[in-house]
Amino acid sequence: MSELLDSFETEFAKFYTDSNLEETNLQKCLDHTHEFKSQLKKLKAHLNKHIQESKPEVYNKLSDKEKQKFKRKRELIIEKLSKSQRQWDHSVKKQIKYVSQQSNRFNKSTLNKLKEFDIDSVYVNKLPKETMENVNEAIGYHILRYSIDNMPLGNKNEAFQYLKDVYGITNKESTEFIEMGQIVHDLKKGDTESCLKWCSNEMESLSSNHTALSSLKFDLYTLSAMQIVKHGNPVELYYQITQNAPLDCFRHREKELMQNVVPLLTKSLIGQPIEDIDSKVNKELKECTSLFIKEYCAAKHIFFDSPLFLIVLSGLISFQFFIKYKTIRELAHVDWTTKDELPFDVKLPDFLTHFHPIFICPVLKEETTTENPPYSLACHHIISKKALDRLSKNGTITFKCPYCPVNTSMSSTKKVRFVML
């Protein structure tokens, strides 16, 4: 499986024309098409001028030499038009041919190999039918998390009905995400007011992360300033600098201000052109949107990454271990005996492992399970249920904590649930 993943990465990279995986051959087609359109516009302007000059009242006044020159000029325009069309046609056909060939190679070398084994034979414990409700809920969450900003959100009632009719998502599930989607919609349209309002409301809450929200507020101000610079309105820009500047967010950000905002504002005020302003605005918009979604999810206590996405990603990464185990099982004639524990270790990145809390009982030196959960004593030391039953003789006596002198009874213990902070 590791070889297949390496092959997958290598073949996929061939769809791009640079090592940073930013420009594809299809993007080159688009760039060449834009260039061709620009040339057509220039040639159209030349032709319009030529048509005006070819009117009888103008043309008849020309000398024979000027008429020859006029005719040659028309031929050059036609020749240049024909040459531009041929170059564009050749370039587009070449890129499309390359993409088509690479797509066929990609299917042959990677995608077809994914179908060479049966997934059900790799993982033998099937998903119980009673868990399908949880699966549907995870799918609904995934749709809400990643697609809400692309859905029609004219008003909340219409959005609720749309999500229910199309995806079967209840109003309870979609309530939190619709507000997020509406704010992201506004940001994409260049309106930062709703996001700033949400940010200010959250900063009044004692439980919010004020440092992160202050960063978001600063980035929103930067985005607004860039958008005004882009539209070239000096009066509005002056008002933005003097009246709308969030001074409380400027603390400890002098370096960012000097690097990102001040040069743009200065050039705009003195009338100098700003290179690549569109890409600068788009980059800042993406940063604001990403930071807002992250802080919104944290404030509403919802996952930033969809659990479904994390589970599928974990499955893809761990597939190589499952396939290796399948081979060993067939050769050694061993079987999988447990349903809640894998017979082998799976190495996953840290961000994929925080949903699986592990606690080793310090008394019995064994991992807690669903049948043997962790319990907190009166002194807040934690041991397993099996150790608790043994020390309390099944709840009939009080006992001293194994790690401190505090006495504990069964009634003063509480079951422990680990949460991600």
UniProtKB/Swiss-Prot annotation:
**Which proteins does it associate with, and in what oligomeric form?**
Identified in the GID/CTLH complex. In the absence of stress, the complex exists as an inactive anticipatory complex (GID(Ant)), composed of VID30/GID1, the E3 ubiquitin-ligase RMD5/GID2, VID28/GID5, GID8, and the RING-like subunit FYV10/GID9, awaiting a substrate receptor to form the active E3 ligase complex. When cells are shifted to glucose-containing medium, the substrate receptor VID24/GID4 is induced and becomes part of the complex, named GID(SR4).
Q: Which domain of life is it from?
A: Eukaryota
GO process terms (BP):
negative regulation of gluconeogenesis; proteasome-mediated ubiquitin-dependent protein catabolic process; protein ubiquitination; ubiquitin-dependent protein catabolic process
One term under GO cellular component: nucleus
Pathway info: Protein modification; protein ubiquitination
Task: Name the species this protein comes from.
Answer: Saccharomyces cerevisiae (strain ATCC 204508 / S288c)
Give the subcellular location.
Cytoplasm
Tell me which UniProt keywords the record has, alphabetically.
Cytoplasm, Metal-binding, Transferase, Ubl conjugation pathway, Zinc, Zinc-finger
Catalyzed reaction equations: S-ubiquitinyl-[E2 ubiquitin-conjugating enzyme]-L-cysteine + [acceptor protein]-L-lysine = [E2 ubiquitin-conjugating enzyme]-L-cysteine + N(6)-ubiquitinyl-[acceptor protein]-L-lysine
Q: What is its EC number?
A: 2.3.2.27
Functional summary from the UniProt entry:
E3 ubiquitin-protein ligase component of the GID E3 ligase complex recruiting N termini and catalyzing ubiquitination of proteins targeted for degradation. GID E3 is regulated through assembly with interchangeable N-degron-binding substrate receptors induced by distinct environmental perturbations. Required for the adaptation to the presence of glucose in the growth medium; mediates in association with the substrate receptor VID24/GID4 the degradation of enzymes involved in gluconeogenesis when cells are shifted to glucose-containing medium.
All copies of domain CTLH, residue ranges: 176-236
Pfam families given in the database record: CTLH (PF10607)
* Principal place of residence: cytoplasm
InterPro entries in the record: CTLH/CRA (IPR024964), CTLH_C (IPR006595), Fyv10_fam (IPR045098), Rmd5_dRing (IPR037683), ZF_RING_GID (IPR044063), Znf_RING/FYVE/PHD (IPR013083)
Which protein is depicted?
A: E3 ubiquitin-protein ligase RMD5
Query: GO terms for molecular function, please?
Result: ubiquitin protein ligase activity; zinc ion binding
The effect of disrupting this gene, in the record's words, is:
Causes a severe sporulation defect, specifically for meiotic nuclear division.
Family per similarity comment: Belongs to the RMD5/GID2 family.
Which residues belong to zinc fingers classed as RING-Gid-type?
A: 361-404
